[in-house]
Regions:
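N-terminal periplasmic accessory domains that precede
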Residues: 7-9, 22-23, 33-55, 68
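Short acidic/polar hinge/loop motifs at secondary-structure boundaries
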Residues: 2-26
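Transmembrane beta-barrel wall of Gram-negative outer-membrane proteins
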Residues: 63-91, 107-151, 174-185
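Flexible, solvent-exposed coil segments and beta strand-coil junctions
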Residues: 45-53, 100-112, 154-165, 204-216, ...
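Face-selective signature of the C-terminal outer-membrane beta-barrel domain
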Residues: 125-149, 168-287
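Extracytoplasmic beta-strand/coil segments of soluble accessory domains associated
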Residues: 1-2, 39
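Transmembrane beta-strand segments of Gram-negative outer membrane beta-barrel proteins
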Residues: 43-62, 81-83, 188
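Outer-membrane beta-barrel proteins
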Residues: 55-69, 109-125, 163-175, 217-227, ...
Length: 287
């Protein structure tokens, strides 16, 4: 998961449920992660319990925005069920003032510009996890993580002595991930996950320049990613406190990306793009 999703989980996880957090600048091979990683280990409950939390936040900066987050956990000696959900209503606005002086062919050009940026959207984060303990050493767990930002609207308005322009952008993002893991009592770990990501956007631009010329275009684009990964790791204890670990992993990904322009007027260089990539990575064994 990315940094934003990890932050959401950390904000919705009670402190008393965290056993430890490992920060690794170079993750070992059995984590199947390239580069840095953060591993959060939660405590296992050995009794019957139910706990939950609800929190809310509010902010006013040009607009009223805020959100609500909640989580609950039901556990028994054999199983545990977790649900985390957060909904945030995001409204942003900022101003950028530009006063720039450029010299071109010995002539000084003074450019004054004011830009207003606005964003408005709802962001939803969901995580559902289930863990079942066959005994003290064997367990299986499955987790679903989702992040949704439907109907995001961004607007940029620019005015000044060089141009007056308006850009409207509409975005719809979705990410879903499901993970399955099995931990055995004899050191064998088997797991896999599937990630689905899609992003669709539509954009309209109109610009009116100081010299009387105009330009405009409409654009639609999108990206769709399907990624599958599986792994198997084995750990063995040796004499004198040594451990031996080895395993294998495989990952396959499909990435579809496109961008198409329409209703282009004025002196604007546009290029339609399309790509459909398939990639197999991390097919390797490690010791």
């Amino acid at each position: 998961m990315d940094a934003g999703q990890l932050e959401t989980i950390l904000r919705n996880t009670p402190v008393n449920r965290v056993e430890k957090v490992e920060v690794m600048y170079s993750a070992p091979p059995e984590y199947h992660v390239r580069g840095a990683a953060i591993n959060m280990i939660l405590k296992h409950s050995n009794d019957y319990s139910f706990q939950g939390e609800i929190s809310a936040n509010y902010k006013n900066q040009y607009f009223n925005d805020g959100g609500m987050n909640g989580n609950f956990r039901l556990s028994t000696p054999k199983m545990a069920f977790d649900v985390m959900y957060g909904a945030n209503n995001v409204k942003k606005m900022e101003y950028i003032d530009l006063d720039s002086k450029h010299t071109l062919k010995g002539e000084l050009h003074n450019i004054i510009q004011n830009e207003q940026l606005r964003s408005k959207y709802w962001k939803h984060d969901l995580r559902v996890a289930f863990e079942y303990n066959f005994n003290n050493k064997n367990n299986i767990n499955i987790a679903y993580t989702g992040s949704y930002t439907p109907d995001q609207y961004n607007n940029s308005r620019t005015s000044g002595n060089y141009q007056t322009s308006n850009v409207d952008k509409y975005i719809d993002n979705q990410m879903r991930n499901i993970t399955l893991q099995y931990h055995s009592g004899f050191g064998l770990d088997i797991g896999g996950d599937y990630t689905y990501y899609t992003s669709n956007n539509a954009q309209r631009l109109y610009a009116d320049y100081q010299d009387g010329s105009q330009s405009s275009f409409s654009m639609v684009g999108g990206q769709k990613i399907d990624r599958y990964s599986i792994y198997a790791d084995q750990k063995q204890s040796l004499s004198k406190g040594w451990n031996l670990g080895y395993g294998i992993s495989y990952r396959f990904a499909k990435d579809l990306d496109f961008q198409t322009y329409d209703k282009v007027t004025g002196n604007i260089q546009t290029q339609n793009t399309y790509s459909n990539l398939r990639e197999q990575t991390d097919r390797k064994a490690h010791v």
